[in-house]
């Protein structure tokens, strides 16, 4: 007890001291001002450009294709020099990529797990050269070193956001999947002991599949994947085990139809959540990019207006005087082209008021026209009476 209470504070204190020291070191490094900011910004722009990503994806894909061709001995023997030159080229490209990224962000580079993966791949690339240099071309581990060169295709992960999303989804399912696999292991343990006791007897049992605990586990794994379970059941039927069919059906129902489907369901749920989150992030990034473009355009327009207002025209006339003079020369019949003027709130307000006034004027004109028509009709009715009276007077 005393050791327990005296050990933990020391470890916590040492951990806090390490964290404090790392934070202090990081703060001190962040205060260092670089004198090559323009060059750093240029390389950052190059690394984040679409062209650079396409070049790296093409390089990794071509390298993987040549690795596949290298598995054919005849092709490798015929184009030996081509493979050697291409290998040097690919390694040079990977090293240049590493140096550029470290140059741009020498501190934050090591905080990204995918960058650490790239560094590990670079180390793996150097293993065959070191073995040939130290042990010669007949080293026992040289074939293994050549085989793990296929891991360089994992560099595509850092350039594919979709693959990174799937990896995040798999990482989020670790605890749930571990729980499901633990339950499956417990189920297999129970059925392995039961199968060993029922079908692993020495006189007439199936010793090849149920003779010991290891073979029983392997047999249950075949039953869980429903791979060759009919052959296993035929072996038990030949030995006339009456409960073998019930045992097999029960284990397949529990392991294959429940636990494995539960495992697949958990993976699908987390993958869907990650894909929805990925789509939301893409939408948010698009909206942010549009907002940034709008801000840049507005800032540029404001700078242009300020520049025009600050510049003086010949004859001591500034921008405001120019606008006032331009207003005096305008007529209501002059055509004008206004960009985005109709989207302003002031224009919409004036336009709505104008429409209301126009409606009022139209209604008044309609009333006036009705009155005019009424007066004209009355005048037409009175005209025959006046003509008849004039004719009677003449007679």
UniProtKB/Swiss-Prot annotation:
SUPFAM superfamilies per UniProt: Voltage-gated potassium channels
Any one Gene Ontology molecular-function term assigned to this protein's record: voltage-gated calcium channel activity
Gene3D superfamilies from the UniProt entry: 1.10.287.70, Voltage-gated potassium channels. Chain C
Major subcellular location class: membrane
Disruption phenotype: Mice are normal but males are sterile. Male sterility is due to defects in sperm motility unability to fertilize intact eggs.
One BP annotation, GO: sodium ion transport
Activity regulation (UniProt): In contrast to the human ortholog, not activated by progesterone. Activated by intracellular alkalinization.
Coiled coil region boundaries: none
Topology within the bilayer: Multi-pass membrane protein
Topological domain spans for side Extracellular: 72-80, 132-143, 196-216, 237-242
TM region positions: 49-71, 81-107, 109-131, 144-160, 169-195, 243-268
Database matches in Pfam families: Ion_trans
GO CC annotation terms, alphabetical: acrosomal vesicle; CatSper complex; endoplasmic reticulum; motile cilium
Intramembrane portions: 217-236
Alphabetized UniProt keyword annotations: Calcium, Calcium channel, Calcium transport, Cell membrane, Cell projection, Cilium, Developmental protein, Differentiation, Flagellum, Ion channel, Ion transport, Membrane, Spermatogenesis, Transmembrane, Transmembrane helix, Transport, Voltage-gated channel
Domain of life: Eukaryota
Location relative to the cell: Cell projection, Cilium, Flagellum membrane
Function: Pore-forming subunit of the CatSper complex, a sperm-specific voltage-gated calcium channel that plays a central role in sperm cell hyperactivation. Controls calcium entry to mediate the hyperactivated motility, a step needed for sperm motility which is essential late in the preparation of sperm for fertilization.
Protein name in UniProt: Cation channel sperm-associated protein 3
Source organism of the structure: Mus musculus (Mouse)
Lineage: Eukaryota, Metazoa, Chordata, Craniata, Vertebrata
């Amino acid at each position: 007890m005393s050791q327990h209470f005296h050990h933990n504070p020391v470890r916590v204190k040492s951990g806090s001291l390490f964290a404090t020291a790392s934070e202090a070191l990081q703060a001190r490094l962040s205060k260092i001002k670089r004198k090559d900011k323009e060059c750093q910004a240029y390389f950052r722009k190059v690394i984040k450009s679409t062209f650079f990503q396409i070049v790296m994806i093409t390089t990794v894909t071509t390298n993987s294709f040549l690795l596949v061709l290298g598995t054919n001995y005849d092709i490798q023997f015929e184009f030996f020099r081509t493979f050697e030159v291409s290998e040097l080229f690919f390694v040079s490209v990977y090293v240049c990529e590493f140096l550029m990224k470290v140059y741009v962000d020498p501190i934050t580079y090591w905080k990204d797990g995918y960058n650490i993966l790239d560094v590990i791949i670079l180390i793996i690339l150097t293993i065959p050269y070191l073995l040939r240099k130290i042990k010669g071309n007949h080293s026992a581990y040289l074939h293994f070193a050549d085989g793990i060169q296929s891991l360089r295709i994992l560099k595509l992960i850092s350039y594919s956001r979709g693959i990174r999303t799937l990896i995040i989804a798999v990482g989020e399912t670790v605890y749930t999947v571990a729980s499901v696999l633990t339950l499956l292991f417990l189920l297999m343990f129970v059925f392995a002991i039961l199968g060993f006791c029922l079908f692993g007897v020495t006189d007439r049992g199936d010793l090849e599949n149920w003779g010991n605990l290891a073979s029983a586990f392997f047999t249950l794994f075949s039953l869980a994947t429903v791979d060759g379970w009919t052959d296993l059941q035929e072996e038990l039927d030949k030995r006339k085990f009456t409960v073998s069919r019930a045992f097999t059906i029960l284990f397949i129902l529990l392991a294959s139809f429940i636990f494995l489907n539960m495992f697949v369901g958990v993976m699908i749920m987390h993958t869907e959540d990650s894909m929805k989150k990925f789509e939301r992030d893409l939408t948010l990034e698009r909206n942010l990019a549009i907002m940034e473009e709008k801000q840049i355009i507005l800032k540029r327009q404001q700078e242009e207006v300020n520049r025009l207002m600050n510049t003086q025209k010949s004859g001591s006339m500034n921008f405001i005087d120019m606008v006032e003079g331009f207003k005096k020369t305008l007529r209501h019949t002059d055509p004008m082209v206004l960009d985005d003027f109709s989207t302003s709130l002031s224009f919409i307000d004036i336009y709505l008021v104008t429409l209301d006034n126009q409606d009022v004027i139209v209604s008044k004109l309609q009333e006036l026209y009705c009155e005019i028509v009424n007066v004209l009709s009355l005048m037409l009715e009175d005209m025959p009476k006046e003509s008849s009276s004039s004719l009677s007077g003449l007679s």
